[in-house]
A protein has these predicted regions:
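Phosphate/NTP-binding elements of NTP-utilizing enzymes
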Residues: 1-167
Length: 167
């Protein structure tokens, strides 16, 4: 490639790689609340344990979905894992919200992913870059084992009901 050719992907990463708020606003066309912006900034800074305490219907699943999509689009290789204590909590709320936001991506990004019932994979490298949904319970602490990558994002919904043995 010559120096005069523009690489849109590199430009995209330069703009959004460290700025998930701009990604949400400009790529997904959404307007995050202030607490959601702070949550996204904390993830971008690499904070390891972020707790969001909020009531029902305030946008936690939405903010987590945005973070997972931003992470998947701007990091490679990467693995995202979403977990909750029960399948209904995981699939009826968080993973359903994640899928709805994947569908709102611009076609050039949306078409890069394959959506399954329990996984979203980067088509070009499905083993290296994906988001998987896994229930976690005290009886199955191994559910989160084996997730290795340069970039891992773990989202735990209803974390207060997930036993410490799982981690």
């Amino acid at each position: 490639m010559t120096a005069s050719k523009k690489n849109n992907f590199i430009d995209f990463i330069e703009v959004y790689g460290d700025n998930p708020v701009a990604f949400v606003e400009e790529v997904l066309g959404a307007t995050p609340l202030e607490w959601q912006k702070q949550f996204l900034r904390d993830i971008a800074r690499g904070e390891r344990r972020i707790s969001v305490r909020a009531g029902h219907g305030v946008g936690k699943s939405t903010a987590c979905s945005w973070a997972l999509i931003w992470h998947m689009v701007t990091r490679y290789p990467q693995k995202g894992v979403v977990t909750a204590p029960t399948a209904p909590q995981l699939f009826d709320a968080l993973f359903a919200e994640l899928k709805s936001w994947i569908n709102k991506l611009p076609p050039v990004l949306k078409d890069s992913f394959e959506v399954f019932s329990d996984k979203i994979a980067f088509k070009a490298a499905p083993e290296s870059s994906f988001i998987s949904a896994r229930t976690s319970s005290k009886e199955r602490p191994e559910a989160l084992a084996g997730v290795h990558s340069e970039n891992v994002l773990l989202i735990v919904d209803e974390a207060s009901a997930v036993y410490e043995e799982v981690f």
